[in-house]
Amino acid sequence: MSLFGTNTTSQTPAGGGLFGTTTSQSAQTGSLFGTATSQPQQTGGLFGSTATQTPSSQLQSTGLFGSTTATSQPQQTGGLFGSTTTTTSQPQQTGGLFGATATSQPQSTGGLFGNTTTTSQPAQTVGLFGTTTQPQPAQSGGLFGSATQQKPATGGLFGSTTTNTGAGLFGNTSNTIGGGGLFGQTAKPATGGLFGQSTTQPQQQQNATPGLTMGQSTNTQQQVVPGVRIDLSNIKSTTRFNDLTEALQQEIAKIDEEIQKCIRDKEAVDAFLPAHGEQLAAIPTDVNFVTRKSEGAHNALSSDILAIDQLRELVKQDADNARLSFKAIDNLKLPMQYHQAGLWSKQMGGAGTAGASGASADADGQSNADLISYFSKTADEMEEMMKKFEKTITEIEAHLTGVEAHAMAMQNVAAQSRNAAQGGVDERVYELAAVLREFEESILKVAGVVGGVKEGVTELQLRDFMGHGS
């Protein structure tokens, strides 16, 4: 080392052999103004032999104004098949008067098949104004995602520490624990894996390293920002149900309940339709049956209406005939001098009639009907009925004649059989009983016919006679 830092020692790069020979670098001392000394780059062997960097055992001293001699670690590369490359820790470095110390960590890469590369971070001593800058190396995992772990580091006086962490190729988690500075400005971006596995970062414990601040320590806690509820105007296709407002969640829940209710109703209708279809198939037959019954009831009602009209007219005629009959009977009961004049005429006598006839006029003001025509018509109807009765009696007599002839024929047959066979007394008794039985049956038949005729005559007298007497 010279007074103005002109003493510079450089080591030529040493290339690793085919199977990874080792190259060692001796310790270098800085100059008064901190002239930098660089170390050679180390390369690993073809099949992953270990390339070892020897540490600088000598404590490096800074210049008068804190221009620290910067020592750069060479880039370490792993072997072809992932043999481990180990980089030893840096020697402890002391800051200058104004703390302008800069230290750079080398970049370390894993092997082809993901062997772990571990880099140790030395403890850094901050300067007076805490301007120490410590960039962390970008750690890359192996081909199959072996984890890379970064050692904790402490910030400077004003906390300008930056930590970067990289994940593995297939997304294995890389964890970084970093200590904040005095004011807690810690940035820790983390990237996910190649196939989307999440990178988990634990909550940082802000343990400030006390600097030149009268021994007081400042702790900064991480602020937790609550989730923002999304209303209907800001909803998107990627919005989760739990991110919505409570009122909107309740409305969606109600809509879902209504949809489920409709689904249950639809299932109930589907279960009801088969049996209901069978019932509907029987409706045409029932309709035809009810139609026939309705038509029959309508025809019956029409017949009843006609019958009622006829009965009403018949009752009216019977009432008129009864009134005339009663009037005629009352007139006949009186002596000859009290008989009403003009009773048997079509109209009641006019002004020339007797006062008695005028006094005996109908109280209701109705005129007398033509009793002669009435009784003449009734007599003609009775004559027709008598002719019917005579015809019926003639038929009965003819039937009785036939019965008598049959009885005589049977009697003759019986006599002939008696004379021819000369049978015993028992046979004659049997024949006589048979003849009497047949005769009795014939008499009963004739009596039935006569009874029917008598009933018909009585019915005509009670109904037809009164019905045709108008």
Curated annotation (Swiss-Prot):
Membrane topology (UniProt): Peripheral membrane protein
Domain of life: Eukaryota
Region (Disordered): 1-92, 196-221
Transmembrane segments: none
GLFG repeat spans: 17-20, 45-48, 63-66, 79-82, 96-99, 111-114, 127-130, 142-145, 156-159, 168-171, 181-184, 193-197
Biased composition (Polar residues): 1-13, 32-74, 207-221
One example of a Gene Ontology biological process annotation: mRNA transport
Keyword annotations of the record: Coiled coil, Membrane, mRNA transport, Nuclear pore complex, Nucleus, Protein transport, Repeat, Translocation, Transport
Compartments, record wording: Nucleus, Nuclear pore complex; Nucleus membrane
GO molecular function term, any single one: structural constituent of nuclear pore
Regions annotated as coiled coil: 239-270, 375-401
InterPro entries xrefs: Nucleoporin_FG_rpt, NUP58/p45/49
GO CC annotation: nuclear membrane; nuclear pore
Skewed-composition ranges (Low complexity): 20-31, 75-92, 197-206
Domain commentary: Contains FG repeats. FG repeats are interaction sites for karyopherins (importins, exportins) and form probably an affinity gradient, guiding the transport proteins unidirectionally with their cargo through the NPC. FG repeat regions are highly flexible and lack ordered secondary structure. The overall conservation of FG repeats regarding exact sequence, spacing, and repeat unit length is limited.
Function: Functions as a component of the nuclear pore complex (NPC). NPC components, collectively referred to as nucleoporins (NUPs), can play the role of both NPC structural components and of docking or interaction partners for transiently associated nuclear transport factors. Active directional transport is assured by both, a Phe-Gly (FG) repeat affinity gradient for these transport factors across the NPC and a transport cofactor concentration gradient across the nuclear envelope (GSP1 and GSP2 GTPases associated predominantly with GTP in the nucleus, with GDP in the cytoplasm).
Assembly behavior: Component of the nuclear pore complex (NPC). NPC constitutes the exclusive means of nucleocytoplasmic transport. NPCs allow the passive diffusion of ions and small molecules and the active, nuclear transport receptor-mediated bidirectional transport of macromolecules such as proteins, RNAs, ribonucleoparticles (RNPs), and ribosomal subunits across the nuclear envelope. Due to its 8-fold rotational symmetry, all subunits are present with 8 copies or multiples thereof.
Entry's family note: Belongs to the nucleoporin GLFG family.
Designated name of the protein: Nucleoporin NUP49
Organism: Chaetomium thermophilum (strain DSM 1495 / CBS 144.50 / IMI 039719) (Thermochaetoides thermophila)
